[in-house]
Structures are given as structure tokens and as C-alpha cells.
Amino acid sequence: VLLMAPSPVLAQRDLSGNWAGLYHEDQPHRIPGPELGDYTGIPLNDAGRLKADSWDASILTLREHQAKPHPSTYSLRGPANIRIRRELDPVTQETIAYELFGTFGQATRMIWLDGRPHPPAHAAHTWAGFSTARWDGNALEVVTTHLKAGWLQRNGVAHSDRATMTERFIRHGNHLMVVTIVDDPIYLEEPFIRTTNWVLSPDQDIRRTQFDVVDEVAGRRKGEVPHYLPGSPDAMRKQTEFASNYKLPAGSARGGAATTYPDGVRPLETSNRGSDPFTVLPDQIQAVHIQGNVHMLIGAGGNIIVQAGEEGILVIDTGTGPRGADVLAAIRQISDKPIRIVINTHVHGDHSGSNETLAAAGRALGGNAPGNFGLALENARILAHENVLKRMSAPSGEPSPRPFAAWPTETFFGDDKELFFNDEAIQLIHQPGHTDGDIVVFFRRSDVVASGDLFTTLTYPVIDAQNGGSVQGVIDGLNRLIDITIPKDKEEGGTYVVPGHGRLADEADVVEFRDMVTIVRDRVQDLVRKGRTLAEVKAATPTRDYDGRYGATTGPWTTDMFVEAVYRDVMR
């Protein structure tokens, strides 16, 4: 009798096959796509509405936006088909994963069933995200994290890179239903639920397409980001035109959780979203291999980059002073070769605080000591832009803020410096923005860029005006990063970017950050042109669609401080 009872494994349904989409009431949302201003049925918050109202479709003509696929939060909604293929364990022949590929999303997605954990918070994000699954009766429940920022609809309704997704794949004979639940603490008041239906269609031709970017608009200014300013005619049209055309009650087309309930009344509930894992540094310093011979250390202040090879170790930034011994121990887990070169991306102590410790633990190659300091004869060389040395040494006669042994032993004055170390060409590019001594470091063979604090995934960019920083400098630096980076496929991977703080990134993440800074700058500039004072600019909250993602009301760098820095920069 026991042998005849169905086991959970035997009860699982095979989801593999070629599937064609079935369109019902949502057909207009598939082809040609939802109308501008149609946010019906979406539990958008105020930030999500402003984000959608600001969206200008011409942004898709930018080279860095053209090849972006739809993330897995939306790719199943397109007017196309999908292929699901089983991945089998070569020994046991058990299904360990499903591979899902769609002609609309174009991002191959692996859904793992073998019990593997999700990556840590500082790992790179992708369009497909990282998906794990388990069977719950006849439904495959899938949980996806590590998603890039993308779209919930093709009319500007967005989700952030903090979004997560839960799905249930349910097969009934030749029909497949997928229930998708997207939760985004940045742009949604509550999880957004929708279903998509498919029919088995073995004869479907599902193939990958090649996409190359082109210049679609001639004469566009470098770094221009198309968007609608708040209160502009185009933004206001989104707020009124759709509801007016379809004679909908005022506000009903604007989305929001209450509009999805009978009589527009949302039941009271307690949020269970919990703390944000993306803003919490690990207790222990963690090492992550990026690619080539380049690694990233997280947890010692600013991010640290380690290049290791036969010639020794090169370190970019050194973290805070109190963590020097821990940083050195973490480096020794990567390689026991001598530390030869230390590079500072800028002057701040969270990136240069352990200079003295790491330099003393190393030794430069040969006896050549460029610059004025004999320390490089015994210790590792410390390289930085000349402005970093000026800030550390206070040559004007004031007391030096940093000990002599922490100063750069070698500097450069111009736009760049070139090294060749561990069989790899390395470019140091002076790009003032966060401070006047900022440099970007490009490992050309490993295809990894260290951005310093020109780019961070955690906060608004810190503008240190006292040390020569400027908002325009940050924007110029971000555009320079975009010029350097080349994605592998569909604006993903390829050149990886290590931010000054936060998770591993690529070009698409830099583009998202560049767009944000540029849009905020343009909004403040528009208010200044209208004669608004600083207090009035702050009251207009030009950052409110980004505050949930990058803002802060307390701490060393608040939203108010960022807005004031932008205002001061625009007023120059």
C-alpha cells in the first residue's frame, strides 16, 4: 500500500516545453502596451507615481538604454513565447533546475531546485535575478532576489533593485498559469500581483536575437537624460489625460493600494518587510572574486580592491584605520605575495585610513623610489593624484591631518597614469567629482573598474565641496565610467564596476545612478530658473522619487545636504 501512495517527488509536474502566451483582458497591455498615465491596478506609492510621470520614452534612444531587456518581473508579460527546459543532475538524473528563456525578455533565467542559497547582498544584480524554488503540491514556488531596477509596465512604471519576486508555476495539462507577486519597498505600497497564462505549443520557434546599439538621435549633448520635469505639460498630461479619455473618476488611474480594493478602502495591515539587508555591512570583512585576478573586500569602510598575481599584490583603497589588521588578514586569504602597490582613489579616511598599515606590511619592487619619500624603498608604494597628497600633507603650513607614513609616496599631476603589473595594463584616470583628487582605476585585462566614491549603490553621491567636489564633476565622472564600461550582453556583465560603497555593479547600474543624479540636477536647475530659494527648493522635494532608495534624514550625508549641494552647484 505504501508503495502505491504518491510521493511529493512523483506528484511534481514537468514544466518543460515551448509555451505560447494567452491574452485575455490584458491584451492591450501586451500589444501595443499600456497608455501613458495608466497606473490602474498597481499599488504605487507617491515616489512610484513621480518616477512614472517623469519617464520620457525618448530615454530608450540613448545608447546605454537601447539594449536593456525586460527583467523577469515583466518579461513574461510581453507579446512573445517562452521555452522551459529541465536541467538534470548528471549522476542522479534528478531535476536540479529549470532554464527559462523568452523571446521578449531575452534574459536566460535559471530556477534552482537543488537547495543552494541566495547570494549575499553585495553580489551583482541581473535582469533575470537569482531564483530558487521548491514544490508546494502541484505548484512550483519560486523566490527571486538580486534583480536590477526595471519596469513593471512599459509606460514608465518602475521597480527598484530592492524588489523581490515570488511566483507560482502551475500546470494543468497543456496549460500553464504563472502567478507573480512583486514586492518593492521603494515604489510599491504593497505587493503587486498578476497572473499570466500559457498554452503548450511545441512548434514555436524560440531563438536568441542579436542587438547592437546605434546612435538614434543626432546632435544630442553628451550626458543628456530625457525626462519630464514635475509640473511640465507632458508630466501633467500623464496625470489627467488617460482618466479623462476613459471617463474614470479623478485619481483612479493614478494607482495606489487603495484603488485596488472595493470602494477604494485599503484594509489596515502591519508591514512585514523587515530591515533592508542591502544597507548593512557584514561584521567580518568578506572577500569576493570578481573576475580575472581582481577581488573585492567588503566591510572595512569603503570597498577595497585587490589584484593578486606573480609579481605581488596591488591594493586600491585601504579602509578605515581601526580595520587595518583585519584588512591585511583578508588580503592574506587571497594571496601571501608581498603588497607592492597601494592606490588611493581619494583622500577620505574610510578609503585611506589603513595606508600606513598596508604599506608597512609590503615592499616595493626594486630600489626605485619615485617622488620625494624614501619609504618606498622599504614599504609598498602609495600612489594617488597630487591633490590627495596636498589634502593629506597640508602644504600651506597648517598641521598635517594624516601621519607622514600614510601620505602618497608617488603622485601624478595630469589626467591619467599608466601601470603594468601582474601581466595587466592598469589605467589611473583623474576624474574630480566627489573630491578634486578622485581617480578611477581600470584593470584592462580583468575588465574591472574601481570607481571610488564617484559611484555608490547605497546613498546619494557625497559632494565634498571643501575638498573640491562638485555635482557636475560627479555627473561627468559617471558619464566617463559609462564610456569605459562595455556590457557583455543586453546591458549586463562584461565590465564590472566596484563602487566606493555598496554591491558589485556593471554599466546598467552606473546608468541608473547617473540618470538619477542628472534628473535631480535638472529639477533643481529648473526651480532655480524660476527664482526659488534654497528653502523653497527643499520644500519642493526634487528627490522624492529617489529618497526611499538613496535618501537619509540622519547621519553624515542626508538628503537635505545633497539637495543643498546641488543647489549651490547650480547657482555658481
Language-model segments: residues:
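PEST-like low-complexity, intrinsically disordered acidic/proline/serine-rich tracts
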Residues: 10-272, 368-377, 461
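Accessory terminal helices/loops
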Residues: 269-277, 364-367, 487-494, 503-572
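Divalent metal-coordination and catalytic microenvironments
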Residues: 293, 307, 317, 331, ...
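Metallo-beta-lactamase
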Residues: 289, 312-313, 320-322, 373-519, ...
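Conserved beta-strand hairpin/beta-sheet module of binuclear metal-dependent hydrolase folds
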Residues: 285-334, 440-452
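Active-site metal-binding motif and surrounding structural segment of the metallo-beta-lactamase
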Residues: 310-314, 322-380
